Regions:
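Short, polar/acidic, helix-capping and beta-turn segments at strand->helix junctions
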Residues: 1-90
Length: 90
């Protein structure tokens, strides 16, 4: 856990999500839904600028809410992605 500006925490969080996506053979283009929790909803515009650096094409559905986050973090993001070829048998 790293504490920084909302932009830094957003970029770090999405970088971690990107690594998990890559392990599943996915990219950010495969993300269909994100639920984003901000410690302070007043940070939304700055959060959104950093978020859009990762989602450059068609944006996934997104819910963003203010939440009480533990450990003094500013952002938490849950992402759901479709796995290419997932659910198909050979």
């Amino acid at each position: 856990m790293v504490h920084g500006t909302i932009e830094e925490e957003t970029r770090l969080t999405l970088s971690h999500i990107g690594k998990v996506l890559a392990q599943a053979g996915c990219t950010f283009e495969d993300v269909v839904k994100c639920t984003c929790h901000l410690a302070d909803i007043n940070d939304f515009e700055r959060f959104d600028q950093a978020y859009r650096e990762f989602f450059t094409g068609v944006k996934p559905a997104r819910t963003t809410v203010q939440s009480v986050l533990g450990g003094g973090i500013k952002v938490e993001i849950d992402a759901i992605a479709r796995v290419p070829g997932g659910g198909q048998s050979a």
